[in-house]
Curated annotation (Swiss-Prot):
Residues 117-139 are annotated as: Disordered. Heterooctamer of four alpha and four beta subunits. The gene is panD. Belongs to the PanD family. It holds the Pfam family Asp_decarbox. It is found in: Cytoplasm. This is Aspartate 1-decarboxylase. It comes from Streptomyces coelicolor (strain ATCC BAA-471 / A3(2) / M145). It catalyses: L-aspartate + H(+) = beta-alanine + CO2. One of its GO terms (molecular function) is aspartate 1-decarboxylase activity. Coiled coil: none annotated.
């Protein structure tokens, strides 16, 4: 049996651009890809914190250090510049692997610069007013 678990998460990134006429995908700053262990072409889920939209697409590598989070193609109808998003990738792993898998969690600021790295998918962004759910157990 395989289990599907969170592998990577870029938490509360700010969408910098949306291009309806570009062929699908999400463009992500190469620094963020490295930090989150994401590869070009990898499947990601996008959760729009601003409006609740959820979608899946694939990664395109963006210019390193640019802070780009670009929504391309039809998804630009759902996700807009300035929206806060969570980008999540998952891995299918065996039961044994699942018990030791530690996700790569990347926290960013309003300019999509890395402000924290970790493995706790429920940890709030460092320095923010966010709180962990009182029912959540720390990783």
């Amino acid at each position: 049996m395989l289990r599907t678990l969170i592998k990577s998460k870029i938490h509360r990134a700010t969408v910098t651009q949306a291009d309806l006429h570009y062929v699908g995908s999400v463009t992500i700053d190469a620094d963020l890809l490295d930090a989150a262990d994401l590869l070009p072409g990898e499947l990601v889920h996008i959760v729009d914190v601003t409006n609740g939209a959820r979608l899946e697409t694939y990664v395109i590598e963006g210019e390193r250090g640019s802070g780009v989070i670009g929504i391309n193609g039809a998804a630009a109808h759902l996700v807009h510049p300035g929206d806060l998003v969570i980008l999540i990738s998952y891995a299918q792993v065996t039961d044994a692997e699942a018990r030791s898998l530690r996700p790569r969690v990347v926290h960013v600021d309003g300019d999509n610069r890395i402000v924290g790295l970790g493995a706790d998918a429920s940890e709030p962004v460092p320095g923010s007013d966010q709180e962990r759910s009182p029912q959540a157990v720390s990783a």
